[in-house]
């Protein structure tokens, strides 16, 4: 019996794997169950599971609400080990607790029961951060009806505790550390980094990592990229370098070596930017070689994301207050409070927050303790007026990044921050106080820089965006909504300034013309009878009219991608409503600009009287006003005015209309404008102001070109600089001829879902699992999943799928990594985010060539950048990037399969040296896969 929780011994552990295949474990041992037996066990309760919603889905049931009879072990883990990683499955829990990976549902059920006992024992011995604090929250959870509360309270009371009032434990904002002001760091210096010094620093880092010496290619990389850390000689001409380093070269430590030397000699900071969260986390881990002491590392290497990624303590407090009144998920919030107390930086999206936590039970989206509800997504921060300002995770991260040696950021943040700084500089203002100057930048995953720039420097007027602007100005208008409008944020600051109050009132009045509550149902109702309110909704309704008149659904149906058409020539109705919408936006823009000027005057007129808190509030408000009144609204009006005037197309831009669909019906419409070549604003905002820029990736060069870096220069903006960048190309040290195979299957019809599914099923079985299937369309992914999930389960292989399983891609990849014989289906997001070394990923199958989608934007770029050759380059790069996911270590083996007989051989020229592409029938490919990977398993 378990002294900490006798009930646990009486509650069977249930695991349901894809297929479904089920197993249970209790005092009598572990056993396999039929689906019907598993359903009865789940319905009867009490039962221990790992991810209740996913378990129910696999049994064909609805996700259950929380119940005292459903013990989700993942919630117990989140309480006992807050802010610690765990893949959200029974096997993931076992691995997290140091157990061997259990194979099959019965073994996983037994492991699940063992894990729960281990966690309760751990809690009894060493509760974090203190027994009293954990007990306060546990008692609150008990009153809220948490299934685990009895066992948790028993474990915590197994040793003496102080009696008396402990509070709810939910007020985490009173217990997180506060930041302190420090003197400004000053301007960065220009001391160069010598190549030999970079080599020496790399050697030091490798010793700290327990390695004897640098690989020759890694040492060469570190020495060569020191070029990007030399002083620039002329304004607008950065030291720019493009460096391709194949998988296994060790480029991360290779560039951290000179970057750390530059930061030590010159002051803050080198910005290291990535495209994916996975690499951001990896670089953060690698920085431990630079700063082995965790306390020093916390100061010197700071992970920085946009404000919308971090827990807002004021939002959390308001959510707790609402939940205590019955309007929210109090149990989820209590577990989030445990996490917030332990979190390194409060990052809820890709940090140490368990993103699977809000998805375990059937909780309405608006009530979940999720990032969507708890971060500052709407720009409503009141800055110094917030009672939690000194404890704010966002402010702590911002201040830490100002003094750090390394700021580990992402492309989106770096580009939008640079664009904002550029806009302020054009008005003679200093850059944003929320960042240090972007003087030295390393863009890792540089092959994504073009796409990141395309997103950062584009404009989109949609119903959702316009409604968000209305909320930002006017605040929440529906019942039960949380949020703060301009008046709530600023009225007390401008109370004695009549001109500012007048501008504020005019902005509130004008914003009423923007889409309000229920706008989506008015512009695109199921009945088809639109009833728009206001000029912006009328314009969007007209946009939908033009879309219906000129297009058919793209992507095979409205439930997939919606529709798109060129904005010009516009329907007369579109032109007329565009003009009215432009004037409505101008009416919002003018008072916002006036308010910004009044706030700037306030900073100037009362410079000697304003306290630091008041100044911070005003500067924060000005940042929000600048982004909307000086950047967003002018961009929207420019699009609308061009449509109203039916002006000729600007050769530098592509304007188009599109609709977005969900569950088979249109839910939004948008007018979009993108640069044909977004590297022009990239150059102006990011490259030219910088002093040194390193762009690196394992797949930058195109070996089919006479100049392998010509395309990379174009797609990174380097071609727009006065001087050509320095280039470097280092091959992977891996023996791909020995460790990898690449096949094109010639007898599978790619348009026949049954044939594709059969091929993928047999290849996964031949590999014994560890297969990743990549699709270019969600519809085909779902069709294949439905056809192969059960047959794979019958053979003991679990199949997970993006857009099918109710988990975000990162969580699916975590499970895939933890369960070495599982398989995963995904699209681009999975391809770019997969970092799975070892046998867990040993087979990669493409359903077809990943050509770029032939939309209007791609058509314009195709014409600009080389026609068919441009298509080839994009597809070749995607294939190369996917192949790079397959072999991550020198001892990995993997098979790459393309199920598209029409795939041109030229698209595979970017694969590493030593790879021989073979074309063969499916049967031969299955046999070759089994032989190659089977040989590895028996070595």
Range-by-range predicted roles:
Residues 11-123:
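Conserved DEDDh/DEDDy metal-dependent 3′-5′ exonuclease domain
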Residues 89-159, 896-898:
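Acidic, Mg2+-coordinating catalytic module of metal-dependent nucleases/exonucleases
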Residues 190-243:
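Conserved pre-motif I regulatory segment
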Residues 192-204, 268-269, 274-405, 412, ...:
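A substrate-engagement module of RecA-like helicase motors
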Residues 234-258:
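Walker A/P-loop
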Residues 371-402, 407, 418-430, 588, ...:
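A contiguous, basic/glycine-rich beta-loop/short-helix subdomain that forms a polymer-engagement track
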Residues 733-751, 804-904:
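Conserved RecA-like P-loop NTPase helicase motor core
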Residues 778-803:
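Conserved helicase motor "Helicase C" RecA-like lobe of SF1/SF2 P-loop NTPases
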């Amino acid at each position: 019996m378990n002294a900490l929780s006798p009930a646990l011994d009486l509650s069977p552990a249930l695991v349901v794997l894809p297929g479904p295949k089920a197993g249970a474990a209790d005092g009598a041992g572990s056993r396999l169950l039929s689906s019907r037996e598993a359903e009865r066990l789940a319905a009867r309760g009490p039962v221990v599971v790992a991810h209740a919603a996913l378990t129910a889905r696999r049994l064909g049931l609805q996700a259950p609400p929380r119940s005292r009879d459903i013990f989700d072990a993942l919630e117990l883990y989140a309480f006992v080990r807050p802010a610690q990683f765990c893949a959200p499955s029974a096997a993931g829990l076992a691995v997290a607790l140091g157990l061997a990976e259990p194979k099959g549902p019965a073994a996983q059920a037994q492991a699940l029961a063992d894990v729960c006992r281990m966690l309760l024992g751990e809690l009894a011995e060493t509760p974090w951060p203190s027994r009293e604090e954990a007990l306060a929250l546990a008692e609150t959870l008990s009153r809220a009806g948490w299934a685990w509360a009895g066992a948790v309270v028993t474990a915590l009371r197994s040793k003496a505790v102080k009696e008396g009032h402990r509070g709810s434990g939910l007020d985490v904002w009173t217990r997180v550390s506060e930041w302190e002001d420090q003197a400004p760091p000053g301007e960065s210096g220009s001391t160069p980094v010598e190549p030999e010094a970079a080599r020496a620093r790399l050697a030091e880092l490798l010793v700290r990592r327990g390695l004897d010496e640098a690989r020759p290619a890694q040492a060469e990389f570190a020495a060569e990229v020191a070029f990007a850390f030399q002083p620039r000689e002329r304004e607008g001409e950065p030291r720019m370098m493009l460096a391709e380093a194949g998988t296994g070269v060790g480029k991360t430590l290779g560039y951290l070596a000179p970057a750390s030397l530059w930061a030590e000699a010159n002051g803050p900071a080198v910005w290291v930017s990535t495209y994916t969260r996975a690499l951001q986390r990896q670089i953060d881990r690698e920085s431990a070689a630079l700063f082995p002491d965790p306390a020093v590392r916390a100061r010197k290497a700071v992970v920085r994301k946009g404000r919308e990624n971090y827990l807002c303590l004021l939002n959390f407090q308001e959510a707790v207050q609402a939940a205590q009144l019955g309007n929210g998920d109090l149990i989820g919030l209590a577990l989030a409070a445990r996490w917030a107390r332990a979190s390194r930086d409060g990052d809820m999206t890709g940090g140490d927050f368990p993103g699977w936590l809000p998805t375990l039970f059937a909780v309405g989206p608006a009530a979940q303790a999720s990032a969507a509800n708890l971060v500052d997504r709407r720009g409503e921060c009141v800055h110094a007026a917030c009672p939690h300002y000194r404890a704010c995770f966002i402010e702590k991260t911002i201040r830490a990044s100002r003094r750090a040696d390394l700021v580990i950021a992402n492309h989106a943040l770096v580009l939008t921050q640079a664009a904002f700084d550029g806009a302020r500089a054009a008005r003679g203002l200093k850059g944003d106080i929320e960042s240090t100057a972007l003087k030295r930048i390393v863009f890792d995953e540089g092959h994504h820089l073009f796409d990141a720039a395309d997103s950062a420097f584009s404009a989109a007027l949609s119903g959702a965006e316009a409604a968000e602007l209305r909320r930002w100005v006017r605040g929440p208008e529906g019942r039960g909504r949380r949020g703060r409008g301009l008046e709530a944020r600023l009225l007390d600051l401008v109370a004695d300034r009549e001109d500012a109050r007048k501008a504020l009132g005019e902005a509130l009045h004008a914003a009423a013309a923007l889409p309000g509550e229920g706008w989506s149902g008015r512009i695109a109702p199921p009945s088809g009878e639109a009833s728009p309110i206001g000029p912006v909704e009328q314009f969007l309704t007209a946009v939908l009219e033009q879309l219906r008149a000129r297009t058919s659904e793209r992507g095979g149906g409205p439930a997939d991608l919606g529709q798109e058409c060129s904005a010009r020539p516009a329907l007369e109705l579109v032109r007329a409503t565009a003009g009215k919408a432009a004037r409505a936006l101008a009416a919002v823009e003018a008072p916002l600009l006036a308010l910004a000027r009044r706030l700037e005057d306030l900073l100037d007129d009362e410079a000697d009287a304003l306290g630091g808190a008041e100044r911070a509030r005003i500067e924060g408000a000005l940042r929000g006003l600048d982004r909307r009144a000086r950047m967003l609204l002018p961009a929207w009006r420019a699009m609308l005015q061009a449509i109203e005037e039916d002006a000729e197309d600007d050769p530098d831009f592509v304007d188009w209309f599109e609709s977005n669909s969900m569950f088979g019906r249109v839910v939004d419409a948008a007018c979009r404008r993108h640069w044909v070549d977004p590297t022009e604003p990239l150059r102006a905002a990011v490259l030219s102001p910088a002093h040194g820029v390193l762009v690196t990736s394992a797949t930058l060069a195109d070996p089919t070109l006479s100049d392998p870096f010509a395309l990379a220069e174009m797609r990174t903006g380097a071609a727009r600089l006065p001087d050509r960048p320095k280039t470097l190309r280092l091959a992977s040290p891996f023996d791909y001829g020995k460790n990898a195979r690449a096949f094109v299957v010639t007898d599978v019809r790619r348009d026949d879902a049954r044939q594709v599914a059969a091929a993928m099923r047999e290849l996964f079985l031949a590999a014994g699992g560890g297969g990743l299937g990549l699709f270019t369309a969600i519809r085909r992914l779902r069709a294949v999943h439905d056809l192969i999930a059960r047959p794979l389960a019958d053979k003991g292989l679990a199949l997970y799928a993006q857009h099918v399983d109710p988990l975000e891609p990162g969580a699916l990849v975590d499970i895939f990594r933890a369960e070495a014989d599982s398989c995963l289906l995904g699209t681009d997001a999975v391809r770019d985010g997969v970092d799975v070394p070892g046998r867990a990923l040993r087979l990669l199958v493409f359903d077809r060539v990943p050509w770029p989608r032939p939309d209007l934007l791609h058509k314009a770029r195709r014409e600009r950048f080389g026609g068919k050759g441009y298509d080839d380059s994009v597809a070749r790069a995607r294939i190369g990037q996917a192949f790079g996911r397959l072999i991550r270590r020198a001892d990995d083996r993997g098979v790459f399969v393309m199920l598209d007989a029409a795939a041109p051989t030229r698209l595979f020229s970017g694969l590493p040296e030593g790879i021989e592409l073979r074309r063969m029938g499916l049967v031969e490919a299955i046999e070759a896969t089994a032989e190659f990977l089977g040989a590895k398993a028996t070595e």
